[in-house]
A protein has these predicted regions:
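Transmembrane helical elements of multi-pass membrane transporters/channels
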Residues: 25-44, 146, 180, 209-213, ...
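Hydrophobic alpha-helical transmembrane segments in multi-pass membrane proteins
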Residues: 26, 30-38, 75, 107-116, ...
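Helix-terminus/linker motif at the lipid-water interface of multi-pass membrane proteins
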Residues: 35, 39-58, 127-134, 190-197, ...
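Small-residue-rich hydrophobic transmembrane alpha-helices
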Residues: 57-117, 154-173, 280-338, 342-344, ...
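Short runs within selected transmembrane alpha-helices of multi-pass transporters and secretion channels
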Residues: 78, 147-165, 173-181, 202-215, ...
Length: 460
């Protein structure tokens, strides 16, 4: 089959031409998009930290890991939609592509409503299980309940953007997020400073921004004249495609959810040091998040490029995609990670002027930013395998290497040498162990996946 031709200037041909140049063209808008999504929460934190006090700062920041646990399963499933859509698009299978798009968007609506209900009814209980201090739990609960009311918009944007990424379009989702980000920032200032709504104000601003980005991405799909055109009358669940989406997406979502559960345990350990350490972790974790968004863009590129080339049987190009992604991810992580630590005090002052909070934040940054290139390596090998449709074994190994190591560390080593330093050394240790497991897995699975591709190539 012949791949579907590009329909507009926003799409990228992933199956021909220079790989590195196209990876950069694909990754940069996606990187900025990820940073802007984090900026929604960062602006919330900056505004409440500056204008509502340290308790409000701790309240908003302490919800991050818990929100990720609730949402990452469904966001992971969107990766399955991305992989399947990329494969069908590259192979020129327009009917299958269209049905995949409508199945994915329908599932996004359903999952968004489910998450809104979960957040509304279970937020406080989950925060209590985390040991959230009494002086911030009411504010944390209020923030989470309002935030989760926007889950349908959040899910629709992410699934719509996953479809656009599948065809190489990362520029328009970036434009949509810029618009939403400006709205978010303006509403934060208005609702918190002018109307004194505190954490409720920043949550309302975030939900409004999510609604705007959702409308824009759906409009983009609706206006398309390609096989990924959206028609609301065609929304349905096709079991065959939902099953294939789940095959890749559910393991990815479970992996992300379980890893974030380990971060919830880590948040609980930080909570035991009091509100100063909580605020320091909140600020440092936001900087840490920007680094992850940057290298995760390369992982997303690896998955999309691999999936399209798998769809047309170009196994040699799949290998080159992984190598170029490793080079690009390492370069980005070393530059941004080193910069984040060198300018750490200045970056932390964006969130707070409290010297004790900044000191805690710097201690955390030392063990998470300088070694962050390891996190990129850890994600790229399973990202490549997911592009080939193989997701279960990488998920199991990631859970064993990352979560298993951190649980042993938190409950075994940390109580004996109780300090923030010892707590956060668990990050690079878990990354190294997981890399070793994932490389071994990649070598074996690659042989199995490539065998029929090589036979098909030899027969031509």
């Amino acid at each position: 089959m012949h791949s579907e031709k590009k329909k507009n200037r926003f799409e990228i041909d992933m199956c021909n031409g220079s790989i590195m140049n196209k990876l950069i063209s694909f990754s940069i808008p996606l990187m900025i998009s990820g940073i802007l999504q984090l900026a929604f929460n960062a602006v919330d934190i900056v505004v409440v930290g500056r204008f509502s006090g340290s308790e409000s700062l701790a309240a908003v920041g302490s919800t991050t890991a818990l929100i990720n646990v609730f949402t990452n399963l469904f966001i992971g499933i969107s990766l399955g939609a991305n992989v399947l859509a990329a494969r069908f698009y590259a192979a020129g299978r327009e009917k299958e592509m269209s049905e995949t798009v409508h199945t994915a968007i329908t599932f996004a609506i359903i999952s968004g409503v489910v998450m809104a209900l979960v957040g509304l009814f279970f937020s406080r209980g989950a925060l209590e299980l985390m040991g959230t201090p009494d002086n911030v739990i009411n504010l944390s609960t209020l923030y989470m309940k309002i935030y989760f009311l926007g889950m349908p918009f959040f899910m629709l944007y992410n699934y719509g953007a996953a479809i656009l990424r599948a065809v190489g379009d990362t520029k328009r989702p970036l434009l949509f997020l810029i618009v939403a980000g400006v709205i978010n920032a303006c509403l934060n200032l208005l609702l918190v400073i002018a109307f004194h709504l505190g954490v409720a104000g920043v949550a309302i601003a975030t939900v409004t921004a999510q609604f705007v980005s959702c409308v824009l991405v759906l409009r983009c799909l609706y206006k398309s004249d390609s096989s990924y055109q959206l028609r609301f009358s065609k929304l349905m669940i096709k079991k065959v495609y939902l099953g294939q989406i789940f095959q890749v997406g559910i393991p990815a979502g479970i992996q992300s959810t379980v890893i974030n559960f380990s971060n919830v345990l880590l948040q609980s350990s930080v909570n035991s040091f009091g509100s100063v350490a909580m605020a320091g972790y909140t600020a440092a974790n936001n900087i840490f998040g920007f680094l992850y968004a940057s290298i995760n863009a390369v992982t997303q590129a690896c998955m999309s490029f691999t999936s399209q080339n798998y769809g047309v049987g170009k196994w040699k190009r799949m290998d080159r995609v992984l190598v170029d992604c490793l080079i690009l991810s390492t370069t980005i992580a070393l530059i941004l990670g080193g910069g984040a630590y060198l300018f750490g005090p200045e970056l932390l002052k964006i969130y707070t002027d409290d010297s004790q909070v900044i000191s805690c934040g710097m201690e955390i940054l030392l063990y998470t930013t300088v070694t962050y290139f390891l996190c990129g390596w850890m994600d790229l090998f399973p990202g490549s395998l997911r592009g080939m449709g193989k997701s279960i074994v990488p998920m199991i190994l990631s859970v064993i290497g990352t979560v298993g190591t951190r649980i042993v560390w938190i409950f075994g080593i940390f109580p004996r040498f109780r300090s923030l330093k010892i707590l956060f050394i668990s990050y690079p240790v878990s990354w190294i162990i997981t890399i070793i497991l994932q490389v071994i897995c990649f070598i074996f699975v690659r042989r199995i996946v490539y065998a029929p591709l090589k036979k098909r190539e030899a027969a031509v």
